[in-house]
């Protein structure tokens, strides 16, 4: 018997059975307990979801922007009222500590919906005078039906981030959560319906990558917003372009540099580094996993990091005292342990962790100890490839030019940060780093107002911020002639 029972698809404002006849299981990564059986969508189910979305989108787009704004604000209120309930589900599904999901996941998702609800009425065109008797005006119109494909690390937050600008602009969305963490997207669908979003405007289809491919290649989808790995992102872009030249937004992987200069407050720098590597058990795309420290302060910095790692409270995610939980799945655990083994084999110095935790209740979960490597080199696998787990690599440097060149020597470009008391150096360095999200003397916050996304192979487009709203609309240009028409023939 599973905790949450059979989970169905959400199409047309309510739950429906999938036609595939297939289900998949989702488990609690802390205990191995079966959480739910989830119905897998078929191609016919995806077609049904898209058709429902097309119908609902016409009704939604016909509303005034103020009407849409009010409905989205009601959804925000419902999310906040149910914060504790949703956080409990998210903790069971992801393995995140309850203190984290209560404070972050639903809260930040609701914040983004509230932000775009406020911007819905500000979607405006332009008026351009040509001459005394002629002018051009532009309209920003919704794209139509969009697809959202979520990642497993922030299930409900990502669903909110993708739906908020899409719905605010008058679009509908068919959303596929990760099959690893599929539960809370369905709760968001219930909330949107209760808030007054018309049937079909937000549909949820479940399944593996084959379902994502059906959405990406669907001729009636106008845009795909994807969060996930680089290789999958390339496939999404290829299929989206080949099928119908869809608009694409992608937030992909990272191997982000955190640079600690010799004048940094080392206590602050250590706090930042530990957060940038071990928050959410290291399963954050923006993690600052390449920690470059000036050689003159490396030992003092490393000592401070190790002191803080000892204070990390690994435990049951449902325990309020826990601030570090398991990895999301057995597959992710195996991947992370493989990277740790490669670090040892390539000569990195293991300073902390480096093992799976199996004592007591840890034995049934996917736990790995917070891990710190020193004496790392740029050519090591743990330094070059995204791990997506709690593994910090400490590297030293001598000069500003050197560290910038090394920090940029990667095909990723998602995030970067510097810690220094010299503001001129901070801005100078940040301006030279090839990354889309940057922090100075802090790490990790991504407020609704801040556009987030990557350079290079870390993504295309942005999520959050005003600029994202524009990419959920298309521009129609209209010339108006008030004077005499001069015939050509």
UniProtKB/Swiss-Prot annotation:
Q: Which residues bind NAD(+)?
A: 150-152, 176-179, 229-232, 253, 285, 386
Give one GO term, molecular function aspect: betaine-aldehyde dehydrogenase (NAD+) activity
Q: Which reaction does it catalyse?
A: betaine aldehyde + NAD(+) + H2O = glycine betaine + NADH + 2 H(+)
Modification type Cysteine sulfenic acid (-SOH): residues: 285
List its EC numbers: 1.2.1.8
Instruction: Please give one Pfam family short name.
Output: Aldedh
- Site (Seems to be a necessary countercharge to the potassium cations) residue list: 247
A GO biological process this protein is involved in? Answer: glycine betaine biosynthetic process from choline
Can you tell me which residues bind K(+) 1? 26, 93, 180
Q: What does this protein do?
A: Involved in the biosynthesis of the osmoprotectant glycine betaine. Catalyzes the irreversible oxidation of betaine aldehyde to the corresponding acid.
Kindly provide the name given to this protein in its UniProt entry: Betaine aldehyde dehydrogenase
- Protein's organism: Burkholderia ambifaria (strain ATCC BAA-244 / DSM 16087 / CCUG 44356 / LMG 19182 / AMMD) (Burkholderia cepacia (strain AMMD))
User: What lineage does UniProt assign to this protein's organism?
Assistant: Bacteria, Pseudomonadati, Pseudomonadota, Betaproteobacteria, Burkholderiales
């Amino acid at each position: 018997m599973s905790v949450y029972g059979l989970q169905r698809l959400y199409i047309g404002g309510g739950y429906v059975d999938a036609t595939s006849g297939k289900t998949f299981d989702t488990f609690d990564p802390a205990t191995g307990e079966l959480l739910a059986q989830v119905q897998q969508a078929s191609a016919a189910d995806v077609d049904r979801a898209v058709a429902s979305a097309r119908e609902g989108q016409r009704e939604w787009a016909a509303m005034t922007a103020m009407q849409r704004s009010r409905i989205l604000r009601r959804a925000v209120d419902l999310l906040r009222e149910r914060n504790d309930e949703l956080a409990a589900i998210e903790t069971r599904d992801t393995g995140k500590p309850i203190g984290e999901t209560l404070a972050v996941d639903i809260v930040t998702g609701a914040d983004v919906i509230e932000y775009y609800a406020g911007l819905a009425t500000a979607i405006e065109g332009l008026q351009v005078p040509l001459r005394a008797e002629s002018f051009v005006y532009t309209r920003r119109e919704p794209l139509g039906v969009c697809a959202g494909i979520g990642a497993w690390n922030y299930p409900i937050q990502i669903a909110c981030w993708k739906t908020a600008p899409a719905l605010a602009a008058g679009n509908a969305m068919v959303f596929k959560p990760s099959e690893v963490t599929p539960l809370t997207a369905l709760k968001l669908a219930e909330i949107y319906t209760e808030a007054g979003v018309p049937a079909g405007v937000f549909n949820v289809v479940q399944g593996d990558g084959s379902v994502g491919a059906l959405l990406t290649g669907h001729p009636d989808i106008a845009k795909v917003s994807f969060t996930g790995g680089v290789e999958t992102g390339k496939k999404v872009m290829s299929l989206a372009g080949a099928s119908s030249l869809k608009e694409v937004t992608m937030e992909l992987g990272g191997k982000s540099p955190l640079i600690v200069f010799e004048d940094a407050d080392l206590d602050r720098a250590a706090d930042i580094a530990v957060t940038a590597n071990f928050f959410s058990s290291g399963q954050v795309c923006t993690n600052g996993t390449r920690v470059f420290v000036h050689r003159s302060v490396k030992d003092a910095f490393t000592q401070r990091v190790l002191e803080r790692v000892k204070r990390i409270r690994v435990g049951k995610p449902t325990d309020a005292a826990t601030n570090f939980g398991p990895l999301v799945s057995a597959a992710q655990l195996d991947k992370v342990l493989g990277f740790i083994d490669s670090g040892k084999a390539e000569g990195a110095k293991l300073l902390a962790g480096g093992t799976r935790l199996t004592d007591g209740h840890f034995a049934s979960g996917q736990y790995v100890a917070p891990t710190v490597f020193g004496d790392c080199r740029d050519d090591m696998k743990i330094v070059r490839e995204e791990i997506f787990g709690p593994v910090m690599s400490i590297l030293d440097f001598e000069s500003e030019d050197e560290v910038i060149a090394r920090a940029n020597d990667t095909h990723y470009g998602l995030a970067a940060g510097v810690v220094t008391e010299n503001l001129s150096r901070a801005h100078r360095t940040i301006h030279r780093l090839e990354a889309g999200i940057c922090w100075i003397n802090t790490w990790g916050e991504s407020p609704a107002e801040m556009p987030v996304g990557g350079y290079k192979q870390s993504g295309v487009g942005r999520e959050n911020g005003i600029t994202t709203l524009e990419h959920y609309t298309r521009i129609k240009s209209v010339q108006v002639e008030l004077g005499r028409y001069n015939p050509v023939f």
